[in-house]
Regions:
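N-terminal beta-strand/alpha-helix entry module and adjacent surface
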Residues: 1-106, 111-199, 209
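Conserved small/polar residues in nucleotide/adenosyl-binding loops
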Residues: 206-213
Length: 217
């Protein structure tokens, strides 16, 4: 049985294990975010920003990837993304619009037809652009179906042999009492059921938030 700390405002269910996660820090990615980075496309190389939050329980850090933001018009040089002001500006606008209650927890790089292996150049890019101690890197080759998470361990990025996919309840229906509607012309009453649909809002549990990063934009 997988042991997960249930945080307030989060409904995790139907957790699926990918690979063989060893003991230590854990990575959880929401099914919709996982599906998004695997969407079929003609693009040979893609980059995503992971939004979510982190938690710590008894010294074990858990990274929750709740959403994946595609980075549009990313420039590449020898399969390495060239992060610049233009790319980050688009990302920050999307964060400000839709993800102010989350933080950046890492990123993903998909290079079709190339083994998803960490190189010194990629690690340098990660350290420069994603310096957080618990920000993860997800390398993919969607053509061959290979993928690996990397996280900080000591002073290096180390591969994680497995991770977890969880399914968050995004919408649920609440039944409220029938509403009586007066029909003045006929002088009769009609009972109509009304359904209220609520959206579940993600909650971040860290003191760093994306909207604080964007305060000066």
């Amino acid at each position: 049985m997988i042991d997960i700390a249930e945080g307030p405002g989060r409904d995790l269910k139907n957790i699926r294990q990918i690979g063989t996660p060893a003991e230590g820090d854990r990575i959880y990615i929401e099914n919709a975010a996982y599906a998004r980075v695997h969407e079929e496309t003609y693009e040979e190389r893609r980059v995503f920003i992971f939004m979510g939050h982190t938690e710590c329980e008894q010294g074990v850090y858990m990274t929750f990837v709740e959403a994946a933001i595609p980075v549009r018009d990313m420039e590449f040089s020898q399969n390495l993304p060239r992060w610049g002001t233009h790319a980050w500006s688009d990302v920050f606008r999307e964060i400000k619009r839709s993800y102010e209650n989350s933080i950046i927890v890492g990123w993903a790089l998909d290079c079709k037809g190339y083994p998803p292996r960490l190189t010194a150049e990629l690690e340098a890019i990660h350290r420069e652009q994603f310096g957080g101690a618990h920000q993860v890197l997800f390398l993919m080759d969607s053509m061959e179906g290979e993928e690996y998470f990397y996280l900080h361990k000591g002073n290096r990025l180390q591969p994680k042999n497995g991770f977890y996919i969880y399914y968050a309840r995004e919408l649920h229906e609440i039944r409220i009492p029938d509403v009586t509607i007066e029909l003045p012309r006929r002088g009769t009453r009609q009972m109509l059921p009304e359904i209220l649909t609520e959206s579940k809002k993600a909650v971040s549990y860290t003191h760093l938030r994306a909207h604080e990063t964007l305060a000066n934009l």
